[in-house]
Amino acid sequence: FMHVTNGKLGNLQLPGAGLTTTELASVRQGLMDAASQSSERDMNELKKFDGFLRDHPWRFTAVVDGPNVAYLNQNYDGGRFRPLQIKAVVDVLEARGHRVLVTLPAKYCEAVVPNHSKFATPLPSQEAEQALDEEEIALLEAWRMRGMLYAVPRACHDDLYWILGTTYNC
């Protein structure tokens, strides 16, 4: 759920590090193909993100898949989406000198977000929601203002975005 482009995070060797330019281009094309199989809109939205990455004033050296981090260890009664868990990862990466990009589905960039932890609802047919507190809302806004938060459009597959983000500085 996290990729650091120098190939290591602490003592953990990451599997995608060191791909050739040709291999990275192939990964990018595969992601575009996957998006186009879903819909033309999905492909166009992913192309916009590709443009965001190419045109951004700096290169990101770490990409954080926000939902996976925010829901880490939250499958218990009372578990919830926790932006402060994302902040903890971002803070460590920035302290190590990385320029961090956080990807989050747009539905998690609002004041009220879905809660998809295992014990969020008593019945699978119900969707629980949770209100973010002021600190969590301010955190998302701060990341947005710093240009390090990308809100994946609704109904788009967010995994394609963080994976694409990792292909620009490997």
Language-model segments: residues:
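Noncatalytic, typically N-terminal accessory segments of nucleic acid-processing enzymes
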Residues: 1-170
